Amino acid sequence: MKITYLGHACVVLQGSKCVLIDPFIPEGEIRVTPDLVAVTHAHADHMGIAASYTAPIITNNEIAHYLRGKGCITEAMNIGGTIVVDGISFTMTQAIHSSWLEDEGIGMYGGSAAGFVISMDGRTVYHAGDTGLFSDMRLIGELYHPDVALIPIGGRFTMGPREGMMAAEFIGAPVVIPIHYNTFDKIRQDVSEFARAINETTDMKTVILEPGMEYEIKK
């Protein structure tokens, strides 16, 4: 499986299928035709252009209901549930964050924010979504044994580097990829310091990806 980072919390998982998570940047700049789209919560920086794709969208009940009204194909689920779509397993996990929709200037509840454990071609990736640190991340590691953990470190709206490092230790994935940082000034972080701390004090490896860069999970 290959992971391509597209900036903010948007990543592409490419294997037997193409999974786009939390589309954010303009469609013309993504240059990917996903088979499936996963949306962790309803904020505009994560739903983004999801509604413009014809691919099925995996998300929570509230967002799925909203997107169906826009003509989208959806696969609704909720925290703790697992579904298999086109041979790809999606488990929705807890995230500590808010979630709301806006339609024609009217705000609406967007259901619970979430993360995803996604398994494809014998490899497993945990995308934490936007979240604060919570101790049950240990259970995610124990239950699903992800090969890679995608962890937000921007601070202010999610965990910062200190909490992100503890999250990485809780999860225990051999590879950590930081996300959701440096998109704008309020979430600017020194990602090299985060990587150094993990690489020097744990057995895990931190992979820093600039937008457009890829990481391949070796078999």
Swiss-Prot record:
KW Hydrolase (keyword) present: yes
InterPro entries: Metallo-B-lactamas, RibonucZ/Hydroxyglut_hydro, UPF0173, UPF0173_UPF0282_UlaG_hydrolase
Coiled-coil region(s): none
Covalent S-S links between cysteines: none
Keywords: Hydrolase
One GO MF term: hydrolase activity
One Pfam family hit: Lactamase_B_3
Family: Belongs to the UPF0173 family.
Protein name listed in UniProt: UPF0173 metal-dependent hydrolase Mhun_1705
Species name: Methanospirillum hungatei JF-1 (strain ATCC 27890 / DSM 864 / NBRC 100397 / JF-1)
